[in-house]
Structure formats: C-alpha cells, structure tokens
UniProtKB/Swiss-Prot annotation:
Name recorded for this polypeptide: Protein FD
Basic residues bias (residue ranges): 1-12
Composition-biased stretches (Low complexity): 26-50
Domain bZIP: start-end pairs: 214-277
Post-translational modification: Phosphorylated at Thr-282 in a calcium-dependent manner by CPK6 and CPK33.
Organism: Arabidopsis thaliana
Length: 285
C-alpha cells in the first residue's frame, strides 16, 4: 500500500510538472502570433499601452528554460514509472498529425499540436498458463497504421538528434507479451517432458546406434569377403596361365630335341667313309 501511494504521488507530481511546461509552451505559441500582429498594427494605429507590453514581457519565457523544464520533467517521470529501468529512454516529442499541419506553422505550434494528442486506451487481459498460474497482461491499443513521427532529443541544449521512434509504453507492452509467450512455451515443454519419460528416448537412441553399427559391420565384412574372393580368383588365373605356359615350353623343347637328333643321324649317313692308315703290329723296342 505504501509503495502504491508513493507511486501515485510521484505520478501526480510529474503530471503537474508537465502541465506547467505545457502552459509555458502554449503561452509562447500564443504570444508569437500576437506579437507579429501587434507589429503590423503599429504602423497604421497608435502604440499599445505600456501595461499590456509589460504583461506580455512577463509572460515570455526563453527557449532554454522551456527545454530545461521539459527535460527534467520527462526524465523524472521515466525514472519513477518505467517498468524496465535498464532501458534508458530519452524524452521525446512525437508529432502524429504532421501530414495535416500547416507548412507555415512554427515550432511552438508543432509542440502544441503534439502535446494535445489523446492517450491510447488500455485494457487488461488475464490468461492462464498450463501450469495453473494466471498472468495479467496490459495491452495498449493504438491506431493500426500510425503516421511517421518526428523524434527529437531534449538532452542537448540547442542541437537535435534523431532517435528511434519507439514509445516506452509500447516497448514495455511488447516485453510483457514476450515474457508471457516464453512462459507458455516453457510450461508446454515441461508438461510434454512430464508425459513422455526421458528413458524411452535414450533406449531408442541406443537401439538405433547399435543397429546402425551392426549394419555397418556386416557390410564391411561382406566387402572384405568379396575382395578376398576376387584376389584369390586373380591368383588362381595367374597360376593357371603360368602352368599352361610351362607345359607349352616343355613340349616345344622336346620337339626341338627330337628334331636335332634326326638331323645328326641324317648327316652321319650322308658322310662317306674315310681311308685311314692303320698299324698292323708294333715292334718291341
């Protein structure tokens, strides 16, 4: 209860600061056209009273003061009420109806038009996870096709930088949706794992691996047997070829030997007998 009361009090303080800055900005925007009209009317009519000019000077505020007030109020509001403090969102202005703006409008009119936009309606939806926990999600409804917005940084004094056009509320809403979906997916996975025991998956995987290794071993054994049979067949064919060649050479050798013997016999028959001197007796000396 104390934290909620503190939260509401801080929210009211930030709202009052914003209202003060809005009044200052509107006074600037209203004073600029009035000053231009007064300058044009002085040429044709008499000058305005000194009291009105003094009141107008008192109502004028410098641009640097307006920037500082807006910057401080926005930073205070974001630091107090941001659901995700780790995301450092910078204060920004978003003009949503810049297509319909007058091209001759000034920067004060742009600020006035951007601050007059209506807040988007929110709704809370309660969903139940499979594990029985109920989750409340805040949904922010906006236009389906928002026009492009001009985003300016207020931390730099006179310069402007272009920032991402994400709204902190929309970012927090998307984070809530993501967390809700992740919790649902985790609950579904846990319920599925509870229904199906993990041991069956391990057994099936082990059986598949054993069957695969057995099939590979059988195929390898068949290939080895086939290669051994092919090598034996090649060796046997080579041996048979050598044996045939040896037999052929042996037969050829026998034929050549017979032919040589025949030639020798024919030569001996054809050669005539030679006359030779023979000693009849020997003398004993």
């Amino acid at each position: 209860m104390l934290s909620s009361a503190k939260h509401q009090r801080n929210h009211r303080l930030s709202a009052t600061n914003k209202n003060q800055t809005l009044t200052k900005v509107s006074s600037i925007s209203s004073s600029s056209p009035s000053s231009s009209s007064s300058s044009s009317s002085t040429s044709s009519s008499s000058p305005l009273p000194s009291q009105d000019s003094q009141a107008q000077k008192r109502s004028l505020v410098t641009m640097e003061e307006v920037w500082n007030d807006i910057n401080l109020a926005s930073i205070h509001h974001l630091n107090r009420h941001s659901p995700h403090p780790q995301h450092n969102h910078e204060p920004r202005f978003r003009g949503q109806n810049h297509h319909n703006q007058n091209p001759n409008s000034i920067f004060q009119d742009f600020l006035k038009g951007s601050l007059n936009q209506e807040p988007a309606p929110t709704s809370q939806t309660t969903g139940s996870a499979p594990n029985g926990d109920s989750t409340t999600v805040t949904v922010l409804y906006s236009s389906p096709f928002p026009p492009p917005a001009t985003v300016l940084s207020l931390n730099s004094g006179a310069g402007f930088e272009f920032l991402d056009n994400q709204d902190p509320l929309v970012t927090s809403n998307s984070n809530l949706h993501t967390h809700h979906h992740l919790s649902n997916a985790h609950a579904f996975n846990t319920s599925f794992e509870a229904l199906v025991p993990s041991s069956s998956f391990g057994k099936k995987r082990g059986q598949d691996s054993n069957e695969g290794s057995g099939n590979r071993r059988h195929k390898r054994m068949i290939k080895n047997r086939e290669s051994a049979a092919r090598s034996r067949a090649r060796k046997q064919a080579y041996t048979n070829e050598l044996e045939l060649e040896v037999a052929h050479l042996q037969a050829e050798n026998a034929r050549l030997k017979r032919q040589q013997d025949q030639l020798k016999m024919a030569a001996a028959i054809q050669q005539p007998k030679k006359n030779t001197l023979q000693r009849s007796s020997t003398a004993p000396f």
